[in-house]
Amino acid sequence: MDKSESTSAGRNRRRRPRRGSRSAPSSADANFRVLSQQLSRLNKTLAAGRPTINHPTFVGSERCRPGYTFTSITLKPPKIDRGSYYGKRLLLPDSVTEYDKKLVSRIQIRVNPLPKFDSTVWVTVRKVSASSDLSVAAISAMFADGASPVLVYQYAASGVQANNKLLYDLSAMRADIGDMRKYAVLVYSKDDALETDELVLHVDIEHQRIPTSGVLPV
């Protein structure tokens, strides 16, 4: 036997024989698979409750959809006692509501804390009936039913929480400008009284272009 054959035979002797099957998975492996499945289901549940799109702002860093423009309105909540609520219907300017059949694609809320802000607020947009008086009881029930995504905005030492925007996609609902009066911005002041000089809400409504001053907006 030459040297190469001797070396090969040595390797074969050292190689362990292949067994019929791998050992059964450990309990740790089984627990990991169960945990992974639970996390996957949780992610799917959370994704179903999130807005369809969550860009920083379609007004500033993302172009409007082709054929669309936007109208912005500003809401400044009044004083809200600790644990109480505030609601305001979306009221667009007359120059926009004149074209009530123009479709609305998205609504975005941007929370702008003022220097004195030191609270925690919950903010959402909901479609409400024409007869709703947006009472504290009615708004409380809408926050509790989980039917709409909610932005929780908390005081941050930097002055601006990383996530201060919430975007709703209404394109599948075929909502139009005339429907906007059926929607309301709702605010819940959770941990402290919210003063009038603590918070401003900017609501950006993306809709089909409308004639303005005799020309179409760019």
Swiss-Prot record:
The main location is virion
Q: Which Pfam families match?
A: Cucumo_coat
Q: What are the boundaries of the region Disordered?
A: 1-28
Cellular location of this protein? Virion
Q: Which UniProt keywords apply?
A: Acetylation, Capsid protein, Ribonucleoprotein, RNA-binding, T=3 icosahedral capsid protein, Viral nucleoprotein, Virion
For this record, the Gene Ontology CC terms, alphabetical, are:
ribonucleoprotein complex; T=3 icosahedral viral capsid; viral nucleocapsid
Basic residues composition-biased segments: 11-21
- Give the sites modified to N-acetylmethionine: M1
- Does the entry feature the keyword Protein transport, yes or no? no
UniProt GO MF annotations: RNA binding; structural molecule activity
Q: Which Gene3D superfamilies match?
A: Cucumovirus coat protein, subunit A
Q: What is known of its domains?
A: The N-terminal arginine-rich stretch does not seem to be the major RNA-binding region that allows formation of an infectious ribonucleoprotein complex.
Q: What does the similarity note say?
A: Belongs to the cucumovirus capsid protein family.
What is known about what this protein does? Capsid protein. Probably binds RNA and plays a role in packaging.
The protein here is known as Capsid protein
Organism annotation: Cucumber mosaic virus (strain FC) (CMV)
